[in-house]
């Protein structure tokens, strides 16, 4: 099994223990994600220490204030590291106001350019205020205009109304623990519609622990619970979904 999106540096417990617990649960590859200068460096360092860990580097939209050419150059430099396999997470977050929409747009556009130059996938964060779709709609428009052939991962997929649009574009949809919540049946139904070669699973740890662990701090080992729910709604065995997401991650991240 794989975890396509985690934040090891933010999880409770030691890094070695988290990686060992994941391996014991059958999780043998994970992508740990940077969000700012400090967590980018930590993600790369974790990837250097562990064979099973790979990194993504970028600037989260909530951290987009102050994004400039120097920040972009630093991300591009880290992006060339042999264990960095994606740029991000980046995108738009209109739920919080830690950075203005224009600051987020500048950072997003710059990171699409970096991903294009490096030939790396881009990890997309999207969050809207309840009942709105302006962020995800603008993300689609921006990627359509700028991303070209860059592989796109819609992390913590939360736009079931756009699952068909994502499939048409060949983008990857990665499902997190919130897809297991009783109130999120629309996400499970969306997971059933994603093409076999474009589905991924993730934890987004330490956030969004799947239902059996809800209320606890999430960790990569718990991705198996999300995978079980996704397998069930897709009408396949856990083992078949495991083979599918492992193959998809291998094709995407080259690990």
Features from the language model and the residues they span:
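Mid-domain alpha/beta scaffold segments of enzyme catalytic cores
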Residues: 1-255
